[in-house]
Each structure stands twice: as C-alpha cells, then as structure tokens.
Amino acid sequence: MSEFKLTTVEEFEEATARLLETGAKVGADAWQFRVKNQTPHCKFGEQGVCCRICAMGPCRITPKAPRGICGCDVHGIVGRNFLKFTAAGAATHSDHGREICHTLYCAKDGGNYQVKDPEKLIRIAKEWGVETEGKDIYDLAHEMAETGLMEYGKPFGYQRFLDRMPAGQKEKLIENEIAPRAIDREVSTSLHMAHMGCSSLPEALVKQSIRCGMADGWGGSMMGTEFSDVLFGTPKPIDTEANLGVMVEENVNIVVHGHDPSLSEMICEYADSKEMIDYAKSVGAKGITVSGVCCTSNEVAMRRGVPMAGNFLQQENVVLTGACEAIVVDVQCIFPALGPLSKCFHTKFITTSPIAQMPDAEFIRFNAETAGENAKAIVKMAIDNFKNRKPELVHIPQLKQKATVGYSVEAIVKVLDSVTNSQVDETGTTKPLLECITSGVIRGAVAMVGCNNPKIRPDYAHIELMKKCIANDIVIIASGCSAQAAAKAGLMDKSAKDLCGAGLKRVCELADIPPVLHMGSCVDISRMMILAAELAKDSGLQINQLPVVGCAPEWMSEKAVSIGNYVVGTGIDTFLGVDPYASGSSEMCELLTEGTRKWTGAAYTVEKDIDKLVDLMIERIEEKRTALGI
C-alpha cells in the first residue's frame, strides 16, 4: 500500500497555472486577472462606510464629513449595510428551502421525485404535531410541504424548529427579540429597517441581523436540509474522490454547479441510465462522468458518491481543462464569467433557473413537473457536444484524493452507536462523543464552513487551520467549499488520522472515520446546529457552554453573513478570516465581537492572520473546557 500524502496548495496552484496557459492560447479571461484589475478595492466599501440607500447620496463618511446628508452617522450606516448584507443571504438560502418544499409537494409514487426516507418524513411530521397515522406517505409529504411553506409567511408564532433547542434557549431568544418569526417577515422587516429614515441604532440593527440569520438557519436552511433528505435520502458515509483529476478524458464530462439538489439529482439519474451511456458510446466516448462544483457537488457526493471536481474558485478550471462538455448550473455562486469562458472552448454553459439567468448561456428552464424531460435533454446535449472537443486544448490535471463523505447527524449518531456498549449504555445519542470530550481525548470541535475568497490564498486557510486543529485533538465538521478544500487535500481520507494528535487518532481508528467529517452543503450548516443542540441536551448544558466554535476563514458571499449570524445566534462563537465590512464603526465592532454575548452567549472574532486565528480558536475551546471544569 502506498504511503498516504496530502495534496498541497502549491500543487493546486501549479495545476491552475498550467490551465491558465491553455486559457491564454484562446484569449480566455479568469478570476486571477480580474482580481488584478479590481485591486486596490474601495476602502470606503471595505469599511462599510459608504451609503447609497437614497438618491440624496451616495454619502461616504470621512473625518471631514462624519454624517450623511440625512444626519446618519458611521455607526448607523455600517449597521444598515450589515443588515442588508444579512437579509440578502437569508433570502437566498431560505429560497432554496422554499424550492425544496415545492419539490416535495410535487413528489409522487413513480414520479420524477419520490420520498426516499419515509421514516424521516414521519419523524418530522410528529415533531410538528402533524397526524401521521393511516396516511399515504405522499399525502403526508404534500401536507408537510404545505406546512413548511407556511413557515415563510405565517402571521403569528416562531419557527417550528426552534423547539429542537435545549430547554430555555428558545425562551431567551424570544425575550431578547431575536427569535425568528415567519422567514419572509424577517427578510422584509430587515429591508424596511434599512430603508432611509428608519433604524440607525446599531444595537437594533445587529439584533435584527441575528434574527434574520436565525430565520435562515432554523427555518429555510433547516427545511431545505431536512426535506432534501426526505426526497433524496439521508446521507450516510460513502466513498468518493475530489479534485480536477476526477474528470475522465475518454468520457463525456458533465459538471453540475450551484446549490439545488433537485437539478443535480435528476442529471445524475439520467447520466447513469443505460440509454444515455449507450448513446455516449455511440459518439465515441467510453462513458459519462458527472462531477460537481460548489454545494451541488456536496449534495450529490454525500448521497451518490459523485466525485467533486472542485470548489468555488475552481469553477473556471473545469472549463479550462478543455474536456468539459457541459457545465450545468442552478443558483448561487455561479460566475457570470462562465458564459464568455465557455465560448473559448466547446463547453455548453447551461442555466436552468429563472433566478440565475446569465449572458452567453443556453437556458433550459428546469421545474419539478418536467424534471425528467429537462435532465434527459441536458445529458443528450452534453453527449452531442463530445465530438466538438478540440484535442489540442485538453488537459486534465492528475490531482485527486479519496474522501469519505456523508456524515449527517443521523450518520454520526450511528457511528457513535458502533462504539457504544449496547448492553450497558443508551444508543441513539451523542453521549460517546461527549465522553471523549469530557475525558479530554478530544478537546472540542470546530465547524469549518464557507467559501473561497481571492483576498486570501485559496484553500490555504481552510487546510492549514484544519491541520493544526486535528493535530491538537480537535475534530472538524465541515461543509460547503471548506469541505471540498479538505477533500481535495486528502483530509477526508481515513488515512489522515495519522496527522492527528494521539487522542483524536485513537477515536478515528475506533470509529473508522476521517478527522474531518463532511456534513454537506452550506444549507447543511443547519445539521451542525442540530448536532450542537443534541450535544447540549445530552449533556444538560446550553449550546454556548460547549467547547465548540465555528470558523469561516475565506468567506465571501452574503449567505455567509446570514450563516455567521445564525451560528452566533445559536450560541457558537464564530471566527472569521475576512472582515464583514464593519471595521469603519467602533460601535458595530464592539457589538459584533462582544455585545452579542448578552443575548446569545456568543460573538465574532475577526483575525486575518491565519496562525493567530487558529490559536484564538483553540484558546476559546480551552476556555470553555475550563469553565466546565473538564
């Protein structure tokens, strides 16, 4: 057996440099060049001190002009911008959940979409107080879909999933006016508060930012996660591979990119069919390879083992290989640059959602009723495009690593059951993990999430932080592009246990797990909140007492701000490697890094130096252990 070895960031960069050489031959643009054209960035924007919410401005705050034309000071301007940032992210993630609810409503026996996990559907229905006895599973699915959709606009009450929190936490959120009500109400209220002539008090703006984020995390995202499991199956550990080397030169290569599993699941279904594989062979290919980018990739990897071609800043690379017949996208994190780039090659750039329409793309409207027909047409289009490849432009970097993915909360509990003495101990709980933490075998956990950002060397922060954490016996749970960075490096290979401290290594060996656990897409950060709640309930603690922190070292999107706010709102300290455009206001900085503790028991830490950031995380975990006397 060959010795296990991580793939380094330097190797990632060498592969990218070679692909950019191909791009130069055809005059292709790439993000590396656009970053240079946009540098330096606007300092007013970076500090959050520019206001353009009315037509009296734009106003920008300087020492000579400390207030906007309306009289709003820097603290109000930064606060409003932060709230609008959050609202856009919460709307986006929650709309994903809404789409999944609609897909669930369209599910039927023998249809395009079916209920793959009826037990989970019944469990959630009982949790919500919906009668299940004697009901056809699809009647129940439709009722639950409608009930879920009501969470977006119900006139009264709070998000149903808040009842999953430990005793007293929901009540504290209500008391502090940060418990989320209807999802759309929180987004609408946020935009109203940020309108000219409304809120300019930083404390009120931060409170609503947390409330809006909580509507995402404990509302839209949680429904998106839970109902995706009902439709497509609850993830369990499955082996896959990651990095550009998963593309196969002799095959038709279809890359799915975006966030909605409704599209990618159907593409995979038809690409796996004998009819389409035979058709691919008839045009000279040996078969069909579907791989993924971003969170769509995470979705199909953890349920089907579909390989991961890369994360956010690798989306152009899959086209630059010259071997991508079609890049099929749904919503979010998609570069508009993919259209012009694809025209430099033979690649078909196919958009499928009216929410994400782009120039230089072929638009095939995808919906639940015609999903099979749409998917088949897309796969056929990719196969027909195989003959248009330009062999002189084909180069697939031979970089890939093995990864074990698919650690849903249910899967983690099952893994814990495997190391439990069922004759003595209770099964179906997180108590074995708690025992490891209490004894000090594992010091704590870090939820590593988020994007890539050209402001930080891509993937470097994710990988280096993870390596140092696991060496210090801190287990990592990861999602989104952070999870893909880990997978590309090899940190989701079970052999990576050899990089751990002695305690975590022993746990990995006993439980047969990698030290970095793949929990899914960015929407699936809701799984992390559920896991934290279960740990708190099983230990008799509140979430903010657990030796657990969150980290988004390379975040870039509005969704990430919403996520950060619901992680802090849940009671988990959150560490950022990129400033959330709040540095221009001392009051906002104080509120975000300390003031929120009085409402949630958690706050942000912003540190751009990666070595300092990881030390601060470890220090915080140890502080929590000391407070618990463990």
Predicted regions and their residues:
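Anaerobic metallocofactor- and corrinoid-dependent redox/one-carbon enzyme cores
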Residues: 2-630
